[in-house]
């Protein structure tokens, strides 16, 4: 009987040290590396030509002994538009990105302070879709085309500031660097599309295996990294 009581008390004490927060918010995305560049780079097959975008997300945080675990579901959009070559053609390129992220978070907050800090790391599953539009572009028929949906696995890290400015609600201001396509890179091509259209209607973050056989059609020479900085504001409510 004594052992049961002691076990119950220990379980209750452990449970009291576990916290749960849920919330949602908005974010700004700044593509980096091969995900950035210009639409001329996109037409040349070297980068994606994305400028910036926004995201909407839901976040959950579970506080354990000494550290937290967090999970995020987010929907992001990025786009770029401009010329295909200097003074020629029009290109509009947009991606929609659905991501699920999870990982550990280490709280660096001073005791009883309304301002806290954290650092974290995560793994992610990222699904891309989108459209690309060409007008008066050499080697590609004019029109709007769908991007074939593709899933990649990534990682990321960052940190943030926690502000307890009003009762119950914590404002989470985060900065993170995302590597969206660490695993799963591939080139997708068909023989039915005209000219170099295949290069643009799939994510094609791996080298075209036919690169070098025809410079007008097979243009993707290298693997392309899809990375981005992300700045977020999330309102979290304790449960």
Language-model features, listed with the residues they occupy:
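Short glycine/proline- and aromatic-enriched beta-strand/turn motifs that initiate or cap beta-hairpins
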Residues: 14-68, 223-239
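Transmembrane beta-barrel strands of outer-membrane/channel proteins
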Residues: 22-28, 71-77, 119-127, 159-161, ...
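Extracytoplasmic loops and strand-loop junctions of Gram-negative outer membrane beta-barrel proteins
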Residues: 38-44, 84-88, 139-145, 212-219
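Transmembrane beta-barrel architecture of outer-membrane proteins
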Residues: 51-57, 95-101, 152-156, 170, ...
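Gram-negative (and chloroplast) outer-membrane scaffold detector with strong preference
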Residues: 61-140, 148, 165, 229-239
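Predominantly the C-terminal beta-signal and adjacent terminal strand-loop region
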Residues: 166-239
